[in-house]
């Protein structure tokens, strides 16, 4: 199947053969496993001090005193050590030694990447994620390698407008909301929707040029992963490939 290659002006300048990776079977189950594996690999173990609430000589008086048989401090009636006592240990706390990482086989992870790449060419999946693609000329969108050389935000804004993906960036900007819950107190005050993903063969400045656009991610094709292609385990992210990047896909993820 032939696809068009677009210039920075949004005009078709060439054609190329669509890589075989875009014929991969759609496997949302494998994609979800790969994304969860990447997310859980970043989980930092947490839990209380093993001796918290236990640094006391409190002992139970035993039966026959007419009071509950909980451990009590010496020469007093105050309870200690037990979970229901003030300053006592925690009942069933999180364990630092627990392994949260959901591992995945190497071949399974590569299958997930291939399937997620193929999903970027399906209009129904891209629209189901909420992306605005009314003005996008084709999926997958392939652009000349000059895109990777742009270093200024104003220049990338103009290029994105001509390529038809600016509508999706506006959606991400307008969708920025204050996060619900305590995360807003922990350096994660805002939640921004995911916008377009830019996949380049070689980064010659596009990261600097695109980093101020809300929701936009830039990645070299060698570092492509399932989490970038399917944020939140939902495949079908609006993706822009440079010509050199799309030519390397079959070789890297066969």
From Swiss-Prot:
Subunit structure: Part of the 50S ribosomal subunit.
Family: Belongs to the universal ribosomal protein uL4 family.
Protein role: One of the primary rRNA binding proteins, this protein initially binds near the 5'-end of the 23S rRNA. It is important during the early stages of 50S assembly. It makes multiple contacts with different domains of the 23S rRNA in the assembled 50S subunit and ribosome. Forms part of the polypeptide exit tunnel.
Protein name, as recorded: Large ribosomal subunit protein uL4
Keyword list, A-Z: Ribonucleoprotein, Ribosomal protein, RNA-binding, rRNA-binding
Highest taxon of source: Archaea
Entry annotated with the keyword Transmembrane helix: no
GO molecular function, one term: rRNA binding
GO cellular component terms, semicolon-separated: ribonucleoprotein complex; ribosome
Species classification: Archaea, Methanobacteriati, Methanobacteriota, Methanomada group, Methanobacteria
rRNA-binding among keywords: yes
One GO BP annotation of this record: translation
InterPro entries: Ribosomal_uL4, Ribosomal_uL4_dom_sf, Ribosomal_uL4_euk/arc_CS, Ribosomal_uL4_euk/arch, Ribosomall_uL4-arc
Source organism per UniProt: Methanothermobacter thermautotrophicus (strain ATCC 29096 / DSM 1053 / JCM 10044 / NBRC 100330 / Delta H) (Methanobacterium thermoautotrophicum)
